[in-house]
């Protein structure tokens, strides 16, 4: 039963958030801050089983304090909504609508592993890990794991039944076997396949989705393999980049002398040689041929005008 002090009429600006199943979600403002209210749809509000599920989710959330997990603050009676969990508002999108680089995807996946490792250490199995239950903030691609409505612990026996989402639920969950952390590891493999498909993580995806006895035993083992393959891949890229740079430098050392030699060889090319030869011939043709002994030049000189010129001048004077 919710105490009188926990009743609240101070929320405003209610904005419904689309939600499947038996829950209702609403964004609302109080004290200048946005919150998320999570309650039950009207047909389920008087059902003790569903009321217990909501209380169980609150008890789990209030016990978790992790930067990559949504924070719950209280459970209050909200007009028109009934009993609700009051949670932080996350300004972002779900992973199913996210797109980014491979490096960003790797950072997101590592944050997810940290969050799941934390809840597993507290003996909590999420049981519904999927892209729509992983929020990515607009500011900094910060991961927030949400929706612990199907989560299970050793302290709660209410969910010893099939739970999960097709495409992400493990085979053993489908046949209603008891949940353990390897169910979440199967789902993590499906998520990894969505955001980082192919090499170098193909083997990790395959092992996550293998029969339960062949999967990673825990998140630590999975993370160690992920980091090893990531670092190995980065080292391979660096080696390729260094080799390419070395080839460029080597090509420069080899090609520079050849280009320099080619510039020098321009002066002795046949065409240049013929042009130079023709210039010399033209210059020689302008010079008078040397006279032999006793020969007189047929060309008039500047100091000695020809006899024809002298006769013409005399005629003009007369």
Positions of PLM-derived features:
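Short beta-strand micro-motifs within the conserved protein kinase catalytic domain, predominantly
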Residues: 71-83
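AlphaC helix of the eukaryotic protein kinase fold
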Residues: 44-63
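Conserved activation segment of eukaryotic-like protein kinases, specifically the C-terminal portion
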Residues: 159-172
């Amino acid at each position: 039963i919710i105490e009188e002090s926990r009743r609240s009429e101070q929320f405003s600006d209610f904005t419904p958030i689309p939600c499947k199943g038996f829950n209702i979600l609403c964004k609302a403002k109080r004290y200048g801050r946005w919150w998320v209210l999570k309650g039950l749809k009207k047909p389920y509000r008087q059902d003790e089983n569903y009321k217990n599920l909501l209380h169980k989710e609150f008890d789990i959330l209030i016990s978790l304090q992790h930067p990559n997990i949504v924070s719950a603050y209280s459970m209050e009676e909200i007009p028109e909504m009934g009993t609700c969990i009051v949670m932080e508002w996350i300004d972002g999108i779900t992973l199913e609508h996210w797109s980014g680089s491979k490096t960003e995807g790797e950072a997101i996946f590592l944050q997810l592993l940290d969050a799941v490792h934390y809840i597993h250490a507290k003996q909590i199995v999420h049981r519904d890990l999927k892209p729509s239950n992983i929020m990515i903030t607009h500011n900094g691609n910060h991961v927030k794991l949400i929706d612990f409505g199907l989560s299970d612990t050793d302290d709660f026996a209410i969910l010893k039944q099939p739970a999960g989402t097709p495409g992400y639920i493990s085979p053993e969950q489908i046949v209603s076997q008891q949940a353990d952390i390897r169910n979440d590891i199967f789902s993590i493999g499906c998520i990894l396949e969505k955001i980082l498909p192919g090499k170098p993580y193909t083997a990790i995806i395959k092992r996550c989705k293998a029969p339960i006895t062949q999967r990673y035993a825990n998140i630590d083992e999975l993370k160690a393999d992920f980091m090893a393959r990531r670092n190995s891949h980065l080292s391979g890229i660096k080696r390729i980049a260094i080799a390419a740079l070395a080839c460029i430098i080597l090509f420069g050392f080899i090609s520079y002398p050849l280009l320099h030699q080619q510039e020098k060889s321009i002066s002795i090319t046949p065409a240049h040689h013929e042009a130079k030869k023709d210039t010399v011939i033209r210059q020689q043709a302008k010079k008078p041929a040397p006279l032999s002994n006793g020969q007189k030049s047929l060309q008039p000189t500047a100091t000695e005008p020809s006899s024809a010129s002298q006769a013409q001048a005399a005629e003009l004077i007369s």
